[in-house]
Design a protein with these regions (language model features):
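Non-catalytic, well-ordered alpha-helical scaffold segments
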Residues: 63, 117-118, 155-159
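Long amphipathic alpha-helical segments with strong coiled-coil/leucine-zipper propensity
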Residues: 96-152
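Pan-zinc metallopeptidase signature
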Residues: 133-252
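Zn2+-dependent metallopeptidase catalytic core
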Residues: 1-23
Length: 252
């Protein structure tokens, strides 16, 4: 993965508002399709990787960039497990010896973990409610475009379905009355959302708010990941393990 250090302007205000005290560096990662964040507990640094579109038009993708900074804030205030997935040495070895097996298991963990964005967006909404409204509008427009183009394969991807569940959960969690009911939109186009996805939307909606007490919040994270993996019928047994100063994931 090639990346180049960049110095975007105007983001310091968001870092300051979030109270970030660890250095944040920004990197242009042309091969990335979306923005990405890596929080390193050992070096006490944050890296925010910007996709080409985010670098060229930061105002359009500001919700995503600030979202990544909120990941950094949770990493500092709770743990890096809320921003970056790390694995036990056992699974690091599997990644080298059995890359196919690791890739499949790691993807399942990511899908079971990605609702961490609910808590990230709780923090973003507290400071900048207009950004979640912008993000919801953009996401809804994207879904409508997929419908118009009959992109059924993209609509049925796990990432899209979990995004729909999160979108629906946040509509009610944050009282976003102007945010589109995408389940209804899909139904109007003859597409019925699976019960398990609707169930996940309800589950996400009622996720406990973080208390910013690491042990308790990590337990909430772990139990929710276990539950999502169960609902999605993934053959993994995710568990957070404290190793060498880091909370890392073991998959059984």
């Amino acid at each position: 993965m090639q990346k180049h250090k960049i110095y975007p302007s105007g983001l310091e205000q968001y870092e300051h508002a979030l109270g970030l005290y660890q250095p944040v560096s920004y990197w242009l990662a042309p091969e990335e399709q979306t923005c990405r964040v890596v929080c390193n507990l050992r070096s006490r640094t944050h890296e925010v990787w910007l996709s080409e579109p985010a670098y060229r038009s930061p105002e359009l993708l500001l919700p995503d960039i600030v979202h990544k900074l909120c990941h950094c804030a949770l990493a500092e205030r709770v743990d890096t497990a809320f921003s970056t997935i790390w694995f036990t040495e056992k699974w690091n070895q599997i990644s080298r010896k059995e890359p196919g097996r690791f890739s499949q298991s790691a993807r399942m963990l990511y899908l079971a973990w990605c609702h961490v964005d609910i808590w990230v967006n709780d923090l973003r909404h507290k400071h900048w409610p207009e950004l979640i409204a912008q993000e919801h509008s953009t996401f809804a427009q994207g879904v409508v475009i997929l419908l118009q183009r009959h992109e059924w394969g993209m609509l049925s991807r796990s990432e899209t379905l979990l995004g729909l569940a999160q979108h629906q959960a946040e509509r009610e969690r944050h009282g976003l009355s102007k945010s589109a009911d995408l389940f209804a939109v899909l139904s109007a186009h003859g597409i019925e959302v699976e019960k398990k996805i609707k169930g996940l939307a309800e589950f996400f909606k009622f996720l406990p708010r973080l208390r910013f007490k690491p042990r308790k919040d990590l337990k909430i994270l772990e139990s929710s990941v276990v539950e999502v993996a169960r609902r999605l019928e993934f053959p993994i047994s995710p568990k957070l393990v404290f190793k060498n100063g880091l909370w890392v994931w073991d998959l059984g």
